[in-house]
Amino acid sequence: MVGMDSLEIRKRFLDFFATLGHTVVPSSSLIPDDPSVLLTTAGMQQFKAYYTGRADPIMDFGSRNTASIQKSFRTSDIDEVGDESHLTFFEMLGNFSFGGYFKEEAIRCAYDFFKEMGLEIEYATVFEGERE
């Protein structure tokens, strides 16, 4: 991955998931068509109707699985902006499944993508429950 720019990373991400049968979906607007939120803050936000069962992914995408690069804007940690790890605007790469697969397959997809990119995963962590 040495010397790879963000355009190449985006392309390889979308191509990888397309080969796995995911429909590539464009980024939705930063101003969502959703009265419950002011701005788009996550990649999954544009798919809310599919997670709640109000929309049919097969009818709209021809697949239960999608991949996208979503423009996102967050203000919840605005006081942290400038510390080299917090931003207000960023693009979130995501793969989503609406009943096509679950956690085990999602983890396998992520691992295979990292492997294809030449990245090594030294360890993984799991959060088992509430901290309280």
What is the predicted role of each segment?
Residues V2-E132:
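Structured aminoacyl-transfer and RNA-binding surfaces used for tRNA recognition/handling
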